[in-house]
């Protein structure tokens, strides 16, 4: 059994000052009132043009972000590499909905791939479909509603952006993981990712979908996706996570009067997560996975499953704290 309790290994890339800083930051964030008010105060201060950006950048931003640009991230990437920790560049911009913003996100993702192609310490790229396509448009596609002529053109432009990213990832042979999002746009995202897999995963898994296993239907979807890949002759890549939108999903389901897509309890999420790991290992010659989990039991279970199979087909999380 692998031990995850050695904090000297887990935090070897951190200085004592950084650890103390992180400790007090998380302590403050552990207070719901302070967390809630902190965000509002910070937003107000920014709107009033008060000198708060430096404080944010040296506290919360520094803890969770590598930098504001690829160049700014470079130093941190090199530092982490000294401790055998690899990096994934994620251009995280949400709430933007103009064509200009979508094109900017596409260009940043393409630039990340260009940078990764020259840097072996960046094994993956990642993006969210809502970073390059309008949420409401995806929702309409998700439920099979007819698009207007203008909407169809808009959707075609979004598909062009996605294809451009996936094509470059394929040319560089750098896997790209496409994030999962809310259930009411996920079918649309799944359809797009499946098309990209059929096009670019003919030799190996380059395009990865993301499965949120806190949804009760994702294990079945995983098996259906694998069946399609075998039938159509391509590999599938899956990043397995538990999920990030539980409160939002339950609230919408209750408000709109439909059964929640969320599992009945955490135990069910854990069960399906581990069953997905099991299924991937049983079908390792056609499936590549990234186990995106901070759950120690699931990590130990995957290590146990890996013993009789080839390690080269499995991608474990690179975060040493997992």
Name every feature range the model reports, one short phrase each.
Residues 1-314, 320:
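Positively charged, amphipathic and often flexible ligand-engagement surfaces
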């Amino acid at each position: 059994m692998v031990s995850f309790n050695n904090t000297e290994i887990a935090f070897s890339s951190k200085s004592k000052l950084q650890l103390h800083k992180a400790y007090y930051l998380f302590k403050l964030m552990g207070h719901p009132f302070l967390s809630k008010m902190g965000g509002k105060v910070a937003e107000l201060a920014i709107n009033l043009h008060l000198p708060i950006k430096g404080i944010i950048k040296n506290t919360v931003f520094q803890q969770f972000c590598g930098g504001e640009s690829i160049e700014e991230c470079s130093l941190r990437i090199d530092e982490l590499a000294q401790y055998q920790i690899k990096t994934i560049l994620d251009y995280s911009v949400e709430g933007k909905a103009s064509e200009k913003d979508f094109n900017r996100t596409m260009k940043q993702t393409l630039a990340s791939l260009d940078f990764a192609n020259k840097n072996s310490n960046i094994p993956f790229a990642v993006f969210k479909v809502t970073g390059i396509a309008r949420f409401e448009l995806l929702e309409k596609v998700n439920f099979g509603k007819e698009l207007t002529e203008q909407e169809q053109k808009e959707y075609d432009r979004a598909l062009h952006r996605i294809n451009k990213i996936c094509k470059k990832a394929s040319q560089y042979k750098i896997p790209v993981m496409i994030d999962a999002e809310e259930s009411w746009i996920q079918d649309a995202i799944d359809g797009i990712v499946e098309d990209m897999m059929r096009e670019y995963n003919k030799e190996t898994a380059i395009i990865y979908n993301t499965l949120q296993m806190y949804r009760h239907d994702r294990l079945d979807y995983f098996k259906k996706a694998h069946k399609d890949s075998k039938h159509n002759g391509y590999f599938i890549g899956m990043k397995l996570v538990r999920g990030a939108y539980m409160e939002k999903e339950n609230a919408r389901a209750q408000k709109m009067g439909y059964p929640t897509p969320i599992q009945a309890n955490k135990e069910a999420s854990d069960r399906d997560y581990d069953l997905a790991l099991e299924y991937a290992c049983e079908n390792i010659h056609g499936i590549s996975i990234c186990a995106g989990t901070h759950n120690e039991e699931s990590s130990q279970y995957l290590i146990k499953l890996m013993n009789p199979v080839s390690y080269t087909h499995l991608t474990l999380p690179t975060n040493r704290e997992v």
